[in-house]
A protein has these predicted regions:
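Terminal, low-structured helical/coil segments at or just beyond the last alpha-helical repeat
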Residues: 2-23, 208-253
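Alpha-solenoid helical repeat scaffolds
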Residues: 67-68, 103-104, 119, 139-140, ...
């Protein structure tokens, strides 16, 4: 069979050129709008609908959507709990640079959920997330150093990580740091600092902080109380409040 060499009319060529154009690519704005729509559905408890929005984005390489899909599987929201699938999605997101996913990969390695327990990898990913500013990762690094879990035990380094996190408004870290200042673990004993951090933690429902705060107050002089209350007022005026999206829980100590 011979191949026709007949020229295509100009009008037909224009039609061919038009239909051959690629579809318009989704912009970052499109992705952001879809992610936000998914978040709103998630907050309303419409997990399955959120998954329908996030999954295509995740499969297309969006690391934030990948983290959300991982969270759905980790927590069993709209799907059956599956730590293995959660780990796979978190890993994709973590490798793409998402700090929360990096923290969750570290937590899964530490607890042996969805992957074989490996404290070397747990510390590696947790440290990366902590350095990228994730509060749960910073808290967990403090726990690792306080317990000597996967790292050489160091109360000094534990206090340093608790402080990084506490200064960004992480309430449990504020409570831990306040305790360390009260008893002098990893830091020099300081009732004013203890009062500051225990007060900030206590006002957000950390019961153990309130109990210990009473002990601190009972040992303080009038001048110490005055200085401590002024310091608390300064910190409250800053409005530091770290309320990150729902992710895997911090590792219990």
């Amino acid at each position: 069979m011979s191949i026709s060499t007949k020229k295509v009319p100009k009008q037909n060529r224009r039609d061919l050129e038009t239909t051959a154009k690629p579809r318009k690519k989704q912009t970052k704005t499109d992705f952001s709008e879809k992610l936000e729509r998914g978040r709103k559905l998630y907050m309303l408890g419409n997990y399955s609908e959120a998954m329908e929005i996030w999954l295509p984005l995740a499969e297309n390489g969006d690391c934030e959507a990948q983290a959300w899909v991982g969270s759905l599987y980790a927590n069993g929201d709209g799907v059956d709990v599956n730590s293995k699938i959660a780990f796979e999605w978190y890993l994709k997101s973590a490798e793409g640079g998402n700090p929360q996913a990096q923290a969750n990969i570290g937590a899964l390695y530490a607890m042996g959920q969805g992957v074989q327990k490996d404290m070397v990898y747990a510390v590696k990913w947790m440290r990366r997330a902590a350095r990228n500013g994730d509060p749960n990762a910073q808290f967990n690094m403090a726990v690792f150093y306080a317990k000597g879990d996967g790292v050489k035990q160091s109360l000094i380094k534990a206090a340093e990580w608790y402080r990084k996190c506490a200064e960004n408004g992480h309430y449990p870290s504020q409570g831990r740091l306040g305790h360390m200042y009260y008893v002098g673990e990893g830091v020099k004993k300081d009732r004013i600092e203890a009062y500051l951090w225990l007060s900030l933690a206590g006002q957000h429902g950390i019961g153990s902080a309130l109990i210990e705060l009473e002990k601190v107050v009972g040992e303080m002089s009038s001048d110490e109380k005055s200085a401590a209350m002024q310091l608390v007022d300064i910190w409250r005026s800053r409005g530091n409040d770290n309320s990150s999206p729902k992710v895997f829980s911090p590792i219990p100590s």
